[in-house]
C-alpha cells in the first residue's frame, strides 16, 4: 500500500515479544560501588584534571520525572517511554566512570542505548546501575552513551561525572544552533553517536546519517525538534493528556543497525529505525509530509492495553498517526491510499467478522469513523475513561476487551453504538447489548459507517458535544 506497507515490516513480533521482558530487563552490575569518604575528598582535584571538557558538560541537574513503569501502568499503556536523561558523554568498553551524586537520594545511570548498541533481542547489553549518594565508580564491558534516570516524582538530583567519558555531539533545543551542530560534527567526526534533545523527544543517530539526512536535506535541527515536539503534543491530546498530566520522559527515536530484516519498530523505551529509515526522522520535510512511519511507531508507545484486543496492535496506534497527519495539514492516508472503497466493499458483505479483516487500514476505518462522527474529543475522553477505571475492573481477555470497548465507546458518545459495531461485524454479546441499552442513550440511526474524511457523517442526536468530562468518567462496571 504505497509507502505504508514498509512500515509494517516485522514490527508485530518486536512489539509483542519484548514488552514483558523489557519491563524486568534491567541489569545491575557488580562493578558499581560507593566510596563515600576518601574519594569524595578528591572530587575537586579530579575535576581540575578534566581540563579538556567544560565543567557544565560534566555536571547535571537531573529532574525527577517519575518511574516510567509506574506511569505506563497509570496511563494503561503497553510500553513505557524512555527513562534516559542524556549527558552527551560516551563510555568506552570497560572504561571506569566516576560519578559524584549530591544529596541523599539514589539515582540510576545507564551505559548504552537501547537499539543503537544492540538489537531489540539483546537488551541485556545495556547496563543499568544504582548510584548511592557520594562517589560511585561504574563500568560496562560493552560501553555506550551515558544516561541518568531519576525515578523521583518531582525535584532534582545533582550529579557530576568526575572522571571518564568522551564528549560527543549533543544538540539541545534552546541552547544550540544549526551551526553549533555543524561545529560539533567537525570537532568529533568519529563520535560513537550524535544526540539531539527537544522538550519531549530524544534522537540518537550516527554521525554519518546525521550529516547525510539532516544536514544533507538542509534541515534546521531547531525546527526539526520543534516539529517533533509538536507531533508528540498532538498525540498527547489524542490520549487526553494535558501538558501538566503527561509523562515527561522522552519519546526516543533511535537509529538501529543490528536488525537488517526490519524497517522500523517500537518497543518499550524507544522507537527504532533500521539503517537509512532514520531519514524519516532526521529530514524535516520527510517527517512532516511523509512521516507516517515515525508517527506510527510513536503511536505504539501510546496504545492502551484495555482496548487493544485481537489483531489491533497495528490498527489502534494509527489513530495517533492520522491525528498528526491531519494536524500537519497532510491528505488523509485513508483517502489517498484508496482505503475507504475497500472498507465499504467489506461493509456490504452479509456475514462479517471484524476480527478476520486482514487489512489493518480497513480495520482502522471503523475507529476513525468514530472520531469523524463524534469529533476530536472522542478519543481523549475514551482514554480518560480507561485511566479512571479501577485496575481490578480492567479486562484481561481479548473478548472482554472487545465487549468493554463497545460499552465504553457508547458511554463516551452518549449514544447506543450497537448498530455501528454490528455493521462492522464486531459482534456484541447479549450482555453487552443489555449494558449499552441500560445506559439509556438514544440508539444510533445515522449511517456513520459511510463517513469519510472528506464527507464525515454526524449522528442525528441532540447535544452530541455534551460529552462527559474529567472525574465524571469515574464509574464501575458493577451493576451496569
Model-predicted regions and their roles:
Residues 23-41:
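Sec-dependent signal peptide cleavage junction
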Residues 39-53, 401-480:
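Beta/coil-rich, acidic/histidine-enriched accessory regions frequently appended to metallopeptidases
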Residues 13-26:
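Short, glycine/alanine-rich hydrophobic alpha-helices that insert into or span membranes
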Residues 344-433, 437-443:
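Active-site-proximal alpha-helical
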Residues 37-172:
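Beta-strand-enriched, solvent-exposed domains that form extended recognition/catalytic surfaces
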Residues 4-16:
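Bacterial N-terminal signal peptides that target proteins for export
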Residues 192-373, 382-383:
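Catalytic cores of extracellular degradative/oxidative enzymes
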Residues 152-198:
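Exposed low-complexity, polar/acidic, P/S/T/G-rich flexible segments that act as propeptides
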Amino acid at each position: 500500500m504505497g509507502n505504508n506497507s514498509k512500515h509494517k515490516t516485522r514490527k508485530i513480533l518486536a512489539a509483542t515479544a519484548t514488552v514483558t521482558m523489557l519491563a524486568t530487563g534491567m541489569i545491575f552490575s557488580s562493578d558499581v560501588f560507593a566510596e563515600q569518604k576518601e574519594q569524595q575528598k578528591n572530587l575537586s582535584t579530579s575535576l581540575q584534571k578534566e581540563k579538556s571538557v567544560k565543567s557544565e558538560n560534566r555536571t547535571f541537574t537531573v529532574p525527577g520525572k517519575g518511574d516510567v513503569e509506574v506511569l505506563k501502568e497509570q496511563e494503561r499503556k503497553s510500553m513505557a517511554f524512555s527513562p534516559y536523561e542524556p549527558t552527551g558523554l560516551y563510555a568506552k568498553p570497560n572504561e571506569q566512570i566516576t560519578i559524584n551524586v549530591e544529596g541523599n537520594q539514589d539515582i540510576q545511570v545507564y551505559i548504552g542505548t537501547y537499539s543503537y548498541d544492540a538489537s531489540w533481542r539483546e537488551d541485556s547489553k545495556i547496563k543499568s546501575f544504582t548510584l548511592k549518594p557520594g562517589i560511585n565508580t561504574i563500568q560496562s564491558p560493552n560501553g555506550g552513551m551515558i544516561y541518568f534516570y531519576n525515578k523521583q516524582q518531582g525535584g532534582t538530583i545533582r550529579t557530576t561525572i568526575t572522571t571518564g567519558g568522551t564528549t560527543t555531539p549533543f544538540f539541545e533545543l534552546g541552547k544550540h544552533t544549526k551551526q553549533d551542530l555543524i561545529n560539533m560534527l567537525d570537532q568529533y567526526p568519529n563520535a560513537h553517536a550524535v544526540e539531539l534533545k527537544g522538550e519531549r523527544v530524544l534522537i540518537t543517530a550516527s554521525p554519518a546519517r546525521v550529516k547525510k539526512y539532516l544536514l544533507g536535506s538542509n534541515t534546521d535541527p531547531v525546527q526539526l525538534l520543534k516539529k517533533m515536539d509538536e507531533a508528540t503534543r498532538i498525540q498527547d491530546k489524542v490520549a487526553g493528556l494535558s501538558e501538566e498530566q503527561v509523562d515527561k520522559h522522552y519519546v526516543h527515536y533511535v537509529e538501529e543497525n543490528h536488525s537488517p530484516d526490519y524497517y522500523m519498530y517500537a518497543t518499550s523505551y524507544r522507537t527504532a529505525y533500521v539503517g537509512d529509515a532514520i531519514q524519516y526522522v532526521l529530514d524535516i520535510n520527510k517527517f512532516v509530509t511523509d512521516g507516517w512511519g515515525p508517527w506510527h511507531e510513536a503511536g505504539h508507545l501510546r496504545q492502551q492495553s484495555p482496548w487493544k484486543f485481537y489483531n489491533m496492535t497495528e490498527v489502534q496506534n494509527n489513530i495517533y498517526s492520522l491525528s498528526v497527519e491531519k494536524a500537519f495539514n497532510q491528505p488523509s492516508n485513508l483517502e489517498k491510499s484508496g482505503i475507504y472503497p475497500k472498507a465499504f466493499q467489506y461493509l456490504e458483505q452479509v456475514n462479517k467478522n471484524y476480527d478476520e479483516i486482514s487489512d489493518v487500514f480497513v480495520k482502522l476505518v471503523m475507529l476513525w469513523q468514530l472520531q469523524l462522527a463524534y469529533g476530536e474529543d472522542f478519543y481523549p475522553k475514551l482514554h480518560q475513561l480507561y485511566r479512571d477505571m479501577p485496575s481490578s475492573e480492567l479486562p484481561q481477555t481479548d473478548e472482554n476487551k472487545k465487549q468493554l470497548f463497545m460499552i465504553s465507546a457508547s458511554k463516551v458518545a452518549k449514544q447506543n453504538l450497537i448498530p455501528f459495531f454490528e455493521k462492522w461485524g464486531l459482534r456484541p454479546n447479549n450482555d453487552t447489548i443489555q449494558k449499552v441499552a441500560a445506559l439509556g442513550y438514544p440508539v444510533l440511526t445515522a449511517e456513520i459507517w459511510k463517513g469519510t474524511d472528506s464527507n464525515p457523517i454526524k449522528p442525528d442526536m441532540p447535544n452530541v458535544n455534551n460529552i462527559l468530562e474529567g472525574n465524571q468518567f469515574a464509574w464501575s462496571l458493577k451493576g451496569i
